Design a protein with these regions (language model features):
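Acidic anion/phosphate-binding donor-loop and adjacent secondary structure
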Residues: 40, 91, 104-118
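A charged, aromatic-enriched C-terminal amphipathic alpha-helix characteristic of glycosyltransferases
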Residues: 258-262, 275, 279-308
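Acidic donor-binding loop of glycosyltransferase active sites
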Residues: 77, 198-217
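Membrane-proximal helix-turn-helix segments that form the acceptor-binding/catalytic region
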Residues: 10-13, 17-21, 34-36, 49-79
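Short N-terminal targeting/anchoring amphipathic segment
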Residues: 1-11, 23-31
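Carbohydrate-associated surface elements
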Residues: 85, 103
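Conserved donor-binding/catalytic core segment of Leloir-type glycosyltransferases
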Residues: 113-135, 139-142, 297
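Nucleotide-activated donor-binding/catalytic signature segment of Leloir-type glycosyltransferases, i.e.
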Residues: 153-155, 162, 167-196
Length: 311
């Protein structure tokens, strides 16, 4: 069979052509779709023309992306995607749409206990816009911890492993809060070093925003499941109040905070535990987390192709 896993649509017609030519089943796997974004973040940059012309070009580009993608989806034997919301969205074009979560490699991501000299909240990833990923609940909670003299910068750090564009967004969002002295910025690190970075952290940060028709929808990133796998407390701000929050709750891996008060209480609890023990820990539902391993993903795809090839 043919498996085409693509965000952009240009490989889809090629996969469709090969599948038809050689009479092979076609499985289309979409890890991202245009509709999940709050705005036009799926476009790497604007077209740097007049604003009205930019809008027109963007509308035309979006229309073509969706038209070509949906035509290919209708002809696929099976579609796979990453969240319940994505499944519901894509079933409109192909009823044979199945959920295959993003996941983690269990040979790389597993719990290690390290005593650390600092309490570290860690974020690894990218920010495209505050509409999609908004850290301000975190800043509000940390501001209160600082104001009430519950933390100090020598022991409490927020470490960002991000690119320059993400750093600019974070710094701009933080200007209204007295948190700059708690923050460190690092360049991206090699993938092989990520498990160690996560395991030496005290809280692992996921950034999101509330699910809305004009906001982000269905984001379930690989980094979410890698964070769950190492067994560190996971803090998501701001909760999507949807499938991301439900997954964090069902795995008992942390908190998807809807308010700054919730984030404040969560951070303080784990900070006080760290002060007593030198490390943090959370009792995740290991069986629930293991459902998201790459091994389970591979088994799902094997079942799909076995079923399609037996027709």
């Amino acid at each position: 069979g043919i498996l085409c896993s693509s965000y952009r649509t240009f490989p889809l017609p090629a996969a469709q052509y090969i599948a038809e030519k050689y009479h092979l089943p076609l499985v289309i796997d979409l890890r991202d779709i245009v509709e999940q974004y709050a705005s036009n973040e799926y476009i790497a940059h604007n077209f740097r023309t007049f604003s009205w012309l930019d809008r027109k070009i963007t509308e035309t580009f979006r229309h073509k992306l969706l038209r070509d993608r949906n035509n290919a989806l209708r002809k696929a034997d099976q579609v796979t995607t990453i969240s319940p919301w994505h499944v519901e969205k894509l079933q409109a074009y192909n009823p044979n749409t199945e959920l295959v979560y993003n996941g983690y490699d269990p040979e790389l991501f597993y719990p290690e206990q390290h005593r650390t000299s600092q309490f570290v909240i860690t974020y690894t990833g990218r920010l495209i816009s505050l509409a999609t990923r908004d850290p301000r609940l975190l800043f509000e909670a940390v501001s209160r911890l600082d104001r009430e003299k519950l933390i100090d910068p020598d022991q409490f750090r927020i470490q960002w492993y991000v690119d320059a564009g993400s750093k600019a967004i974070i710094m701009q969002a933080a200007t209204a809060y007295p948190v700059a002295r708690y923050m460190d910025f690092f360049d991206y690190v090699p993938a092989s070093e990520i498990p160690g970075v996560l395991n030496r952290s005290s809280i692992l940060l996921q950034l999101a925003n509330t699910f809305a028709s004009d906001g982000p929808k269905g984001f379930m990133t690989t980094k979410l499941f890698e964070s769950m796998a190492v067994g560190k407390p996971l803090l998501c701000v701001k909760s999507d109040e949807s499938c991301l929050e439900a997954t964090i709750r069902n795995t008992r891996s942390g908190l998807a905070a809807r308010t700054a008060e919730e984030a404040f209480r969560f951070i303080l609890h784990h900070y006080q535990f760290w002060q007593d023990n030198g490390y943090t820990h959370i009792n995740t539902d290991k069986e629930a987390v293991e459902r998201f391993s790459r091994k389970k993903q591979a088994e799902q795809f094997m079942r799909i192709f076995t079923r399609l090839n037996s027709k």
